[in-house]
UniProtKB/Swiss-Prot annotation:
Belongs to the NrdR family. Negatively regulates transcription of bacterial ribonucleotide reductase nrd genes and operons by binding to NrdR-boxes. Keywords: ATP-binding, DNA-binding, Metal-binding, Nucleotide-binding, Repressor, Transcription, Transcription regulation, Zinc, Zinc-finger. A zinc finger (unnamed) spans 3-34. This is Transcriptional repressor NrdR. InterPro entries: ATP-cone_dom, NrdR-like_N, RNR_NrdR-like. Its cofactor is Zn(2+). Residues 46-136 form the ATP-cone domain. Pfam families: ATP-cone, Zn_ribbon_NrdR. GO terms for biological process: negative regulation of DNA-templated transcription. The gene is nrdR. Binds 1 zinc ion.
């Protein structure tokens, strides 16, 4: 590694440590020429392959900027956006691939954004999933509502689906279970 002070091409690693929760390595180096010390950070690169075929480095800032547009006017804090971007990066990096298609980034954004703010999710999804009609919005809203309603429940807990033509013989007598959300 080139010394930032004297530009000498060689340096010696004095110390190495994990940084940023294990996603990077921090190295203290000493220049073999001038003896001055400096710090470097090493992180595995993640390339995003765009639809045009061009590749560019993954950028959390770009994820935040895109999601921020969908969150405009919504009660979403910058900390929430930073956490969402971190979750997206973690999900994309967990694929183990050094290069991911841009579509994978969009898919990785949808889940955490849905948890963060449903209106922002609909805004983002309408662009990312290319909604073309009111029916597309209605379908997405219906899916959100059915998820919010949760599965049907009985007095003893979650209802189990009964195959057509079968009789549900689950016990109705016994200990009552309390389920909270």
């Amino acid at each position: 590694m080139r010394c930032p002070f004297c530009r000498h091409p060689d340096s010696r690693v004095v110390d190495s440590r994990e940084a940023e929760e294990g996603s990077a390595i921090r190295r203290r180096r000493s220049c073999l020429s001038c003896g001055r010390r400096f710090t470097t950070m090493e992180e595995a690169s993640l390339q995003v392959r765009k639809r045009s075929g061009a590749a560019e480095p993954f950028s959390r800032a770009k994820v935040i900027a895109g999601v921020r547009k969908a969150c405009q006017g919504r009660p979403v804090r910058d900390d929430d956006l930073a956490l969402l971007a971190q979750r997206v990066e973690d999900a994309v990096r967990s694929s183990g691939s050094a290069e991911v298609p841009a579509e994978a980034i969009g898919r990785a954004i949808l889940g955490p954004l849905r948890e963060l703010d449903e209106v922002a999710y609909l805004r983002f999804a309408s662009v990312y999933l290319a909604f073309e009609s009111l029916t597309d919005f209605e379908s997405a809203i219906a899916a959100l509502r059915s998820e919010a309603a949760g599965p049907p429940t009985t007095r003893d807990g979650p209802a189990r689906p009964v195959p057509r033509g079968a009789v549900d013989v689950s016990p109705v007598i016994g200990t009552q279970q309390v389920h909270s959300r």
